[in-house]
Amino acid sequence: MDLNLHLASYLYLTPSKFYIQPLDAPKEALIIDRQTCEITVNKIFSKDYLPKNVASRIIDGIIGIKRLISGVYLIVISQSKLVGVINEKPIYKVEQTSIIPFNENRYEPGSGQNQWETTYLAMLESVLRTPSFYYSYGYDLTNSLQRNFEQTVECQSRGVYYVGHQYYDRRFLWNQHLMIDFERCGSITDRYRLPFILGFVCIKEGSIGLNFNWSIISRRGTRRAGTRFNSRGADFEGNVANFVETEQFLECGENFKASHVQIRGSIPLLWGQKVNYRMKPPIDINPHDEQCLPLKRHIEELKKFYGDVSFVSLIDQRGHEGQIAYEYSQKMNRIQQYFIVPYHHFDFHKECSKMRWHRLNILLEKIQPEIESQGYFALLNNQVVNSQNGIIRSNCIDSLDRTNVVQSMIAKRVLEAQIDLANNGLSGNIFLNENFLYTFKNTWADNADALSIQYAGTPALKTDFTRTGQRTHYGVIMDGINSLTRYVANNFFDDYRQDAIDLFLGNFEGHPSPLYKPLSIISYTSLVPAALILFTLVALYLYLR
């Protein structure tokens, strides 16, 4: 569904108001009162109304408004870069944001409120620095191509030709909480409400008998968002940690568009892991008798959005993951009394041990009938020629490394079928084209790294296989370094990251509390030296032992 949002704007700052004047509608302005937070739209605006020498800047969009202890803040996109074009609409990646106080004199210097306000602002800034926020003025990134098209048909049947905020998929809308003040104003602010996703977007060009654009869009869920050991499993409503919808998008010329959607998410049971300075903390499974309830609600939600659901679990059947593998299998068997839900368990580490990565084809052949029956979505001359009526849901223990390997292999098979349909079977095997094969593998590996940094604090493991098709000694060494980096991040910094995410999403409001004051705001790159030192010490110990 096409959006009709305002583009970049001038932001004028007077002592009493913010004025946001769209570059594409210079006679209009959104006005925010800095004292009362009242929001209005002036349709006959002129800069002449403003004081001379008024402070101004150009912004790319509004993320929203956030209330903290001592004041209110306007959050805007101050810099972004073009990623590419999807469905003829530009897609942007956020590069820099600004948090602007409504009241410059919001607290007394040196007061306790000052300390907490500074801490909470640092938390917000740490989330906004996550290098994977995306938006578009013209295309709704919260929805897949299929959902967008279905909404377009529905709206046009009612004489509506642009979607409003009510069609955004709030599961993936990361600034929903920050847009509450705008929603209270009704439709007058619709064109200023920029849907803002966290995840990964990459757009590439290719050619094999025909020119095409190929994209990956990953949308991270908001309902149980968080960090690796702080956000595990499901809640009683069926929301799961690390829930991500990944869409592979294909455009051939002006007439053919296709997409295929997969999802990943934590094992949908009540379980968790508490950090205890071990590399692999013990898995605590809630003994609650109602373990099937969150699983049932999770499946109901998936069926509502996607249709048929097939579960693929890649965790170990023995050892550290053995008990939860058993519980998962038992509950999936019990849930069959409510739904017919295919469940495939593939012990990734056992089956692919000793570099036997070709054994992944065993899993792919097993689920191939479901991939084919679920289908993919395709449009030819704006007419539906295929629909996707189901979803493959993959997970490992983190739903990161093993999951991404399998998702990329499923995506490869689907893309072959889509290209074949687009070119009436004349294109041949797209993956015989070495340039595109390289692009495909590396883009899926980049997707893995982005999602892993968001959840675990480091790039993904096993991406050497995704990038090259085989395991390498270099890849094994990098996995060791990233594993140790995860250890440092998860044990020493993730509580702060979790609090920051919860504050950003509105899961708790800023107020003084016994939270520790963070020593510093850290990034992935600052953890690498610590991990290298640990890795060197472990290697020396093993060598000298």
What are the roles of these predicted feature ranges?
Residues 390-409:
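A phosphate-binding catalytic loop at a beta-strand-loop-alpha-helix junction
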Residues 1-385, 414-545:
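Phosphoinositide system proteins, centered on phosphoinositide phosphatases
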